[in-house]
Design a protein with these regions (language model features):
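Histidine-centered divalent metal-coordination motifs
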Residues: 1, 19, 98-100, 177, ...
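Aromatic/hydrophobic pocket-lining residues that form the small-molecule binding cavity
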Residues: 2, 157, 243
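Generic beta-strand structural signal
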Residues: 88, 108, 258-260
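Metallo-beta-lactamase
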Residues: 91-198, 204
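C-terminal regulatory/interaction regions
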Residues: 205-285
Length: 285
């Protein structure tokens, strides 16, 4: 999301203003800050990756060199101002909307809302899973980041969508992708946030409908949701990580339980999540 920041700053002489989580995290490679055995689901996710994906992974030297250059440049950028929810900068108002990434913000200007990757037309942003920082990382983070639950996870992302919905219907979104696609503009309003929430509700519906009174596991659940063509090679990991985010949310709402061996079972009626989501889509409930 910030791949051209160093070039832009150099060419424009502009300052970098970013969400307050950006500066303390930017010196780390994102996939190296997570303790991979921090939960039963993430432990299972990485076991499957090690057994079924990594043995067939073919290194891409050019891509790795590009990534290395990016991380080195990012670590050296200076953040001139930390942005927090509710800050006002002239006519702009800052809204913190984590979930797709911890540092995602939206900018309100008149009756427009610049949503970045938080709300997109046509496609749905990938939600983060819950974060458990590695101990060596955690001890160097500011106090407000010690509990990352406010900034990571599907529940956090859905809450951020609900936050936008509370603004009311009179905003037009200006997203980072797909505003103009296939020779046409995709003008959309706040209703798009509701559509994305409903998309995730339908995924949760499918997962629980397939579970019923049976037990399952992460890989079985993933293969039951995604068609085979979308699970080839490294795509399996991306799909499983998205399913992990949904399972974490269902565990938080008390609709499933995760056993010590990674087995997944439905709890009660398995409908608590629907009440939670209904209140996000309609704040007046």
């Amino acid at each position: 999301h910030d791949g051209t920041v160093t070039d832009f700053m150099r060419d424009s002489k502009a300052e970098l203003w970013a969400h307050e989580t950006y500066k303390p995290l930017k010196k780390y490679i994102p996939w190296e800050i997570h303790y991979k055995k921090g939960s039963l689901l993430h432990k299972e996710l990485n076991r499957i990756a090690e057994e079924k994906i990594q043995p067939y992974y073919e290194p891409d030297a050019a891509r790795e060199a590009t990534d290395q250059k990016y991380f080195e440049e990012r670590s050296q950028t200076e953040v001139a101002r930390d942005l927090r929810d509710g800050y006002e900068l002239s006519d702009l108002k800052i809204m913190s909307t984590p979930g797709h990434s911890p540092d995602q913000i939206c900018l309100l200007l008149d009756d427009f809302i610049f949503t970045g990757d938080h709300i997109l037309p046509e496609i749905t942003p990938h939600p983060t899973g819950k974060m458990v920082f590695r101990t060596s990382i955690l001890e160097n983070l500011p106090d407000f980041l010690r509990d990352p639950s406010e900034f990571y996870g599907l529940g956090t992302y859905l809450n951020s969508l609900g936050k936008v919905i509370k603004l009311g219907p009179n905003y037009t979104i200006l997203p980072a992708h797909r505003l103009y696609n296939k020779s046409r503009f995709n003008w959309q309003g706040i209703e798009r946030a509701k559509q994305i929430i409903k998309h995730h509700e339908h995924r949760l519906d499918s997962m629980l409908n397939k579970l019923q009174n049976n037990t399952s596991n992460l890989e079985e659940t993933t293969r039951g949701i995604f068609e085979r063509s979308k699970l080839l090679g490294p795509n399996l990991y991306a799909a499983m990580s998205e399913i992990v985010a949904h399972l974490e949310f269902l565990e938080d709402t008390g609709d499933i339980a995760i056993g010590a061996s990674g087995d997944i079972s439905k709890q009660g009626t398995g409908t608590n999540y629907k009440t939670y989501i209904s209140r996000l889509v309609d704040p007046n409930l």
